[in-house]
Amino acid sequence: MSKQDAIEIEGTVTESLPNAMFRVDLDNGFNVLAHISGKIRRNYIKILPGDRVKVELTPYDLTKGRITYRLRKK
């Protein structure tokens, strides 16, 4: 799967799970299980419940994703 095939959508973190996994409610109403990307892990960016994030989904499995960006608070 190439990067162009990935679906990128915004959502809100609702639950923090073990092993850097998170439950995310997407803006379209779906709920996905997401892990954090390597750059977020390497730069020690903290993700807490209530944070707005960008999630990358594959077209093959729309129930799992990767958190690629934490959006700034307004």
Curated annotation (Swiss-Prot):
GO terms for molecular function: ribosome binding; rRNA binding; translation initiation factor activity. GO terms for cellular component: cytosol. The keyword Transmembrane does not apply. It is found in: Cytoplasm. Its main location: cytoplasm. Pfam families: eIF-1a. It comes from the Bacteria. Keywords: Cytoplasm, Initiation factor, Protein biosynthesis, RNA-binding, rRNA-binding. Residues 1-72 form the S1-like domain. InterPro entries: NA-bd_OB-fold, RNA-binding_domain_S1_IF1, S1_domain, TIF_IF1. SUPFAM superfamilies: Nucleic acid-binding proteins. Component of the 30S ribosomal translation pre-initiation complex which assembles on the 30S ribosome in the order IF-2 and IF-3, IF-1 and N-formylmethionyl-tRNA(fMet); mRNA recruitment can occur at any time during PIC assembly. Belongs to the IF-1 family. One of the essential components for the initiation of protein synthesis. Stabilizes the binding of IF-2 and IF-3 on the 30S subunit to which N-formylmethionyl-tRNA(fMet) subsequently binds. Helps modulate mRNA selection, yielding the 30S pre-initiation complex (PIC). Upon addition of the 50S ribosomal subunit IF-1, IF-2 and IF-3 are released leaving the mature 70S translation initiation complex. This is Translation initiation factor IF-1. It comes from Thermosynechococcus vestitus (strain NIES-2133 / IAM M-273 / BP-1). The gene is infA.
